[in-house]
């Protein structure tokens, strides 16, 4: 598997990218020349992250915004209503190429969970949530006398109470006489014997029609009478089902290509990916990159060795770019590390022209689906790492909506399900130890004896263990002292 070669920098103090504080972000840092995927897996399971060749770990007790490593169990992942809405939105766009009404004019839609167009924010490569501000349209609000309106409504209810009772009774009788339940729910007139019935909402009418159709299908005539049977429930659609909901007649085609960062395919598409990155950084973060070198340094160059094993995925372990091609146009790129137990999200950028598709959340779902796909052949690979969860930064809390998600205890290094109880504790105090029961002696942590076997790079071609290095250093120090004493002795003589 090779060696991991690092240059440890020690404790670093810098500006915080989350609370924007000056000289308040405290972390440990090191430069990694090369690293095996297994070693990096062990590092991120101890709270480390990488940005290019630089690896860092927040000192959560001292830093302004404690960062907790978060992962999602992809094999137990549950779609929310908001996730389904985003997946269906993509399906409709691919089918007919039209935007929804709320998206016409380039206005981003806000979903039910309060998320808007998710981009990438922060150093840990996690997608951002809603923007700093949501600007509401400047429409003057009418002055309404709520007290007078409330009294008028109560008087109206008193006058109509008797009529409504009669209407409901007649309506129920007519329902009982009908032999075709499907027709009953499709009535276009909400009247009965000249009495107006209360209007139903469109959603309620659709639900009634759906239930009536299901009931009609479950009626089987036997011996001159009808016998009802239970209708089997439709199985809930999986993430893969939503993604596969495409046809050859669709107006647009979306394809995802995954390519290693040192492959010919990456080089062939470098021009398009850099142009997309430049557009994203300029329009979303107002931070235009200086040149392509900055892009490569940040998102292409990786210390992880690309290695393939018999028990690993066919594409191997290492650093990859997952490219989103809409027809022949590159609209998004996800930077990923594929490790022995997980797929780790490094960064994500997209074309702002397609922000109405909520590509940040959509790509998270596609990356979870990638884990599920890899897990079918590699049983140990089942987690999706989303970088850091910063509870004190509201924009980063969206990560906890991918359920089930787990946070890493910063002291015991054990995983804990992100629940409302943990959220309440983090609301009360930013730094928390999630495992109060584990004693120090039980923690699977680096012990002092292990350092004797760590290899130190003396020059480009020579490595020695830390124990040998200490012995050699002591020998050189004694020789230096001895030579100094001999010189002093000769001068004195």
Language-model features, listed with the residues they occupy:
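A conserved beta-strand-loop-helix scaffold within acyl/acetyltransferase catalytic domains
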Residues: 51-64, 73-78, 83-356, 448-493
